[in-house]
Amino acid sequence: MATKRKKAQKAKDFVKPKLKVGKTAAKPDNHTDTSFTAKTISLPNQSIAKKSKSGVSEEQKQEIDLSHHLSLTKHHASATRKEVLIYIDQHLPSNPSLYKQIFTSIIPLILDQSASVRTTLVALFNKCANMQPGILELHIRSIALFIHSAMTHLHPEIRNSSTKFLNVLVEHAPQSLSKSFFVKTMRSYFTLMSWTLTDDKKSVSLAITTSAAIGGSVKKARIGHLAVLKAFLQASLFPQLSDSAESEINPAIVVSVHPQSYKYLIPAATSQAFAPLKLFANELPNNSKDIDDGKFHISDLDTITAEDLDTRRKVFVDVFQKPVVKNLNSLVKEGGEVGREANSCMTIIDNLEQELKKVAEDE
């Protein structure tokens, strides 16, 4: 019996089972399931290379984070815009190439309706200028454009804070500002202070109406406007350290062709030596009195480029000095802090007149 049972069990291994339709074959007892797939585990925070989840470096991650915050400068809430400016102030990058993106986003906020946003923006401009010297000069065209727009803005609060931004340029980029935007800045100042360049009845009546509508906040803001005007005139009408350093070079030593050759050379500080000849100007005189008088007139302001010191002085004396002195004298009579600042501006103009007299005597 035992032998028959053993033979029957051995025979089962060689018997092919009959499968029913629709059913799979039975799996053997020693079957191993291999249908699973392995999953990788990623730990980017513990990576030696210190890369983010997207595989970018820390510098690229900072740029991406900065781009996100710069997009919030156009947020509808003024509190959010202020917080973004504070964040940018605290996380200014050391890479100068990122500042182009920063200035492109924050410069339009000069015209922001919120006073807190504009105040924070002034601090941010100063921080950028201190961290990256010369960075404001690279973006001075767009900055000056928005500053002049703020100085002539319809909103009085925006006009009141406009000279705070102008003061930043006077402190950190005085030469670039005076060379490229002296005439435009002076004309914007006349609009800001409700002054007139001409004595015609229409302009005078408009100035009287505008000054009568000035509120208390605007009158208080005139103190800051006059203080910045004083600094602007000092930087534009008097030689700075860079100009004096250039003037120390004696052309007679450099050019040794003839002992008096320097008398016939064009000064290096003069950008438009032949501008009075108007060789490239296609314009007709509006008044016969303006012909060959050797002075600049209001009609010439749109075509003047006052890049050198002599041209700026001549433009100021011929066009701006008389109305500026007239309006400053009226402010001096008011007294108080406004009169004190106006008197300091008059001191700058008096110093200019004395220096011009010395130059005329030396010639």
From Swiss-Prot:
Keywords from the UniProt entry: Nucleus, Ribosome biogenesis, rRNA processing
Superkingdom of this protein's organism: Eukaryota
Region of interest called Disordered, as start-end residue ranges on this chain: 1-38
Cellular location(s): Nucleus
MF annotations from Gene Ontology: chromatin binding
GO cellular component terms attached to this protein's record: cytosol; nucleoplasm; rixosome complex
InterPro entries in UniProt: ARM-like, ARM-type_fold, Ipi1_N
SUPFAM superfamilies found in the cross-reference section: ARM repeat
GO biological process: maturation of LSU-rRNA from tricistronic rRNA transcript (SSU-rRNA, 5.8S rRNA, LSU-rRNA); pre-replicative complex assembly involved in nuclear cell cycle DNA replication; regulation of DNA-templated DNA replication initiation; ribosomal large subunit assembly
First-listed, main subcellular location of the protein, grouped into a coarse class: nucleus
Subunit structure of this chain's protein: Component of the RIX1 complex, composed of IPI1, RIX1/IPI2 and IPI3 in a 1:2:2 stoichiometry. The complex interacts (via RIX1) with MDN1 (via its hexameric AAA ATPase ring) and the pre-60S ribosome particles.
Job of this protein: Component of the RIX1 complex required for processing of ITS2 sequences from 35S pre-rRNA.
PANTHER family: REGULATOR OF MICROTUBULE DYNAMICS PROTEIN, TESTIS-EXPRESSED PROTEIN 10
Family classification: Belongs to the IPI1/TEX10 family.
Protein name as annotated: Pre-rRNA-processing protein IPI1
Species annotation: Scheffersomyces stipitis (strain ATCC 58785 / CBS 6054 / NBRC 10063 / NRRL Y-11545) (Yeast)
